């Protein structure tokens, strides 16, 4: 397939594995890239910039294809050493970086000076226009269906994708609610030139996630997500389990972050992914879990998606004859 996204990134298919905390490691990123998509290492999954350098080296040993590093950068009372992580990425020769967060802008000049292509994740067209004006190469637009942080305006992809495609000159990648070739065909028809998937790649054989977590997501339906942190205006879409239900109940009663910190700690979420206990912690998941019913290899997934995409685009075209 050929779009501006495949041309800019040097990949065979316009399919991107989004950054996922604890999941975006070398075994998954390399498998996606080897299958013709763009794999992504999650920078802050690594405990230090030095560990990130080692993970980049490990990924390089597993694929000759391009891959990206994700850096999610938000204001924080005790932020990680973002500058050192960025320096590690630049020094390792990575050529593609996916950024997210309103403080990512501070690091774009350094990335651009190093010849790095920037994909920036946005949940609103006005933010995407600012990112375009400041020089990002590609915008990844997240609809309300997505896992992680969909923003506070609840605009679904069916509206957000064409709005972004109409407003922007840079290529748009559609993110949120996509798991198969049907969704990919829809995204391309709406004006996107690529798709981004997180939850779908979490449920592949190569994903470094316990098999029971993968099977729980396979068994789930589209109603099995919850929105947490709504009252804190930092909304996140996560898998419905005992922990997320307790968080939602606490928010309904009125709570501060400190009241639920012990429930949502990142270490608990990581333990859940590694142990297979679905009720151990918060597990990120999008509404797309309703469309996931198997655990393929990344190669099988991408080849199937591209085949289905072509079939659905051809079928839609036949209606116009």
Report each predicted region and the residues it spans:
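Active-site entrance/lid segments in N-terminal catalytic domains of soluble metabolic enzymes
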Residues: 1-167
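Conserved active-site-proximal phosphate/metal-binding subdomains
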Residues: 151-173, 179-321
